[in-house]
Amino acid sequence: IIIIFMSHLILIRHGQSEWNLQKKFTGWVDVDLTPEGKLEACKAGEVIKELNIKIDHFYSSFQIRSINTLKFIQDTLRNKIQPVKAWQLNERHYGALTGLNKDEMKKKLGEKKIHEFRRSWDLRPDPLSKNNPYHPINIEVYKSLGKEDIPDTESLKDTYERVVKYYKENIEDKIKKNNNILISAHGNSIRSLCKFLFKLDEKQITKLEIPTGNPMMIEFDKNGKISNCLYLDKERAQDLIVF
């Protein structure tokens, strides 16, 4: 009998959210899934179920779109393991752009500037005022966080640093011990993890687009090295960047 030791990391960006549909900068604001987003989450659960592997640990961000995506997946898998919620896996904080329409801001600031805000490595938008109701300091779920942990704005680099720190401290060792992990997170937190795992440079990361609701499965060999990576929903994976 040959026993193959392998672990799997499944990364999924939450299903389509209400503000994805409205083309708004969402960041740390809590908006739920659209009906389409719920369908994406259920479909994700189905394609993960077809793998026939046991998921040992589940993680989500503090945000309802990530939490509910994971709930739909776990319900489909009939897996009742208590998920870990980590604010460090939250979406990038978009500062003063939060709640604004992307198309309107392109007209106001120019397409180039908005592209820089969205895709550059270390550019931060102006900070969000603490008086703004969308500021995390005014949202109940973040009351447990220290004030030094709550950002007013973030670059992708800032997001990368908190996401990767959390991954190294809480998830990396579990992968090395042949655990299967599923993380339900966000476009920029998953881009950050991909930069770290696949050793992407700053130019490559700007081109990486993460689709909603399509699980990316990364396989690790017995030495903890990546041996394979693919999107599980084949119908939607044709034009996606896969390493």
Language model features with spans:
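Short, Lys/Arg-enriched N-terminal segments with co-localized hydrophobic residues
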Residues: 1-5
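Short coil-to-beta-strand
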Residues: 7-16
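Active-site-adjacent alpha-helix immediately C-terminal to a catalytic or transition-state-stabilizing loop
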Residues: 9, 67, 75-77, 150, ...
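Active-site glycine-centered loops adjacent to acidic/histidine catalytic or metal-binding residues
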Residues: 14, 88, 186
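Loop-to-helix element that buttresses phosphate recognition and phosphoryl-transfer chemistry
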Residues: 16-74, 147-165, 207
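Phosphate-coordination/substrate-recognition cap region in phosphate-metabolizing enzymes
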Residues: 42-136, 142-144, 195-219, 242-243
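Short, well-ordered strand-loop elements centered on a beta-strand within folded domains, enriched
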Residues: 223-236
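Short, cationic low-complexity segments
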Residues: 235-243
